[in-house]
A protein has these predicted regions:
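Active-site beta-loop-alpha junctions enriched in small/polar residues
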Residues: 45, 103, 123-127, 153-155, ...
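Histidine/acidic residue-rich metal-binding segments in metalloenzymes
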Residues: 26, 107-114, 135-249, 261-277, ...
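Active-site metal-binding motif and surrounding structural segment of the metallo-beta-lactamase
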Residues: 24-36, 170
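Alpha-helical scaffold segments that flank or form the walls of functional sites
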Residues: 34, 52-114, 135-143
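Histidine-centered catalytic micro-motifs
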Residues: 37-49, 172-181
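N-terminal metal-binding scaffold of metallo-dependent hydrolase/deaminase domains
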Residues: 1-28, 325, 329
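Active-site gating loops and adjacent loop-to-helix segments of metal-dependent hydrolytic enzymes
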Residues: 49-81, 119-122, 181-224, 299-307
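His/Asp/Glu-enriched, well-ordered alpha-helical/loop segment
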Residues: 196, 219-222, 265-345, 351-359
């Protein structure tokens, strides 16, 4: 069994409706496998599942351009089916809760169908239009419900006054942050390689902030416990220090980051600074098939390429405990799953979704 202190056992267990009711260490294992709390998918876009293999990968600006064009061609029925297929894949692969970003209907219903809990955030992207006006804010406040709220997409895609308004709320919010070097350059200088995508021929340049994305969020008082920064690939040591002091968590999405040529996120340094780091599957449009084991393996591989290796135990703690902590959930309260046919965390890291047994 995987606890916060590490792997214990062998032993026998009783689980009722996914919840661990008894653990008897030393009685001899009743199954060949490892008992773990379900995974927490710290960052997700269920609605993009049917766009897998259709987007432009490599440069992130090109990816954003392609996904905007593809979204415009999707029918509401395709979006709903995409959400349902992705939710089903998450469930079958051992995920219990998701921090979901979505700007179209379907995610809440799909998660509910498969018993997935978590937080669904309706993304606000308003830079290309007018600021998130008072009437829209009233709608957002009226929509507020357990597990659902409106929230910002990213510092580069939202008006400052809108971001400041979200900062003032006490809502649990997640925001894409420092995903690429181009994003950091855009915010610190007002221009970057994204200009053609981000601004267009008739758009005014983004006001120069002379701040990194993390510094900007700090200046607006967005950073606080209950808030999550997604990606954090291009954060500096001073950014990490700010994050650690503020109480925010981070979502690490290594397969998506690799496919979009983003810098490798300094996960070990963030965790050493006290930042809880969960693992997110992001979207199938950028990361590929929904597979938590593949995501964990890439997290380990990328950390080694960076020269700041994470241990196998680190990866499992992030997947099973730290992502849940970021949502304010005690992972040990369940549900639990069995990874069948494995006897060590190293062996379990090589598992596939087909080896997940829901209890």
């Amino acid at each position: 069994m995987l606890t916060r202190e590490g792997l214990t056992g062998p032993g026998r267990f009783d689980v009722q409706n996914g919840h661990l009711t008894e653990w008897r260490e030393g009685d001899g294992a009743s199954h060949k496998g490892i008992l773990i709390p379900c995974f927490t998918n710290a960052h997700s876009h269920l609605e993009y599942y049917t766009l897998m293999g259709k987007t432009v990968l490599g440069d992130m600006g090109d990816f954003l351009t392609s996904i905007v064009a593809l979204k415009a061609k999707q029918s509401p029925e395709e979006v709903l089916e995409s959400c349902r297929l992705a939710a089903k894949k998450n469930f079958e692969g051992g995920v219990a809760r998701i921090w979901e970003h979505s700007d179209r209907p379907g995610s809440r219903e799909a998660m509910a169908e498969f018993g997935l809990t978590g937080q669904v955030q309706r993304e606000v992207i308003d830079f290309f239009t007018s600021a998130f006006v008072a009437s829209s804010r009233e709608v957002a406040e009226a929509d507020l419900a357990p597990g659902f709220c409106w929230g910002p997409h990213a510092p580069y895609s939202i008006h400052r006054e809108t971001l400041a308004w979200f900062s003032e709320t006490d809502w649990p919010l997640s925001i894409h942050c420092a995903e690429s070097l181009a994003e950091v350059e855009l915010l610190t200088t007002g221009h970057s390689s994204w200009d053609s995508w981000r601004l267009g021929p008739e758009k005014a340049a983004l006001p120069t902030s002379n701040q990194t994305p993390v510094e900007l969020l700090e200046s607006l008082r967005f950073l606080k416990p209950g808030r999550q920064l997604v990606h954090c690939c291009a954060v500096s040591d001073s950014d990490i220090e700010i994050m650690g002091k503020s109480g925010v968590s981070a979502a690490h999405c290594p397969r998506s980051n690799k496919n979009l040529d983003c810098p490798i996120a300094p996960v070990r340094r963030m965790r050493e600074a006290g930042v809880k780091v969960g693992i997110g599957l992001d979207s199938s449009a950028s990361a590929g098939e929904i597979d938590f084991f593949a995501e964990m393996r890439e997290a380990m591989t990328s950390s080694r390429w960076l020269g700041e290796p994470l241990s196998v135990e680190d990866i499992w703690q992030m997947a099973c405990y730290e992502g849940a902590d970021a949502m304010g959930v005690r992972a040990e309260d369940g549900p639990w799953i069995l990874i069948e046919g494995v006897e060590s965390l190293e062996e379990a890291l090589l598992a596939t979704p087909e080896q997940v047994r829901r209890l």
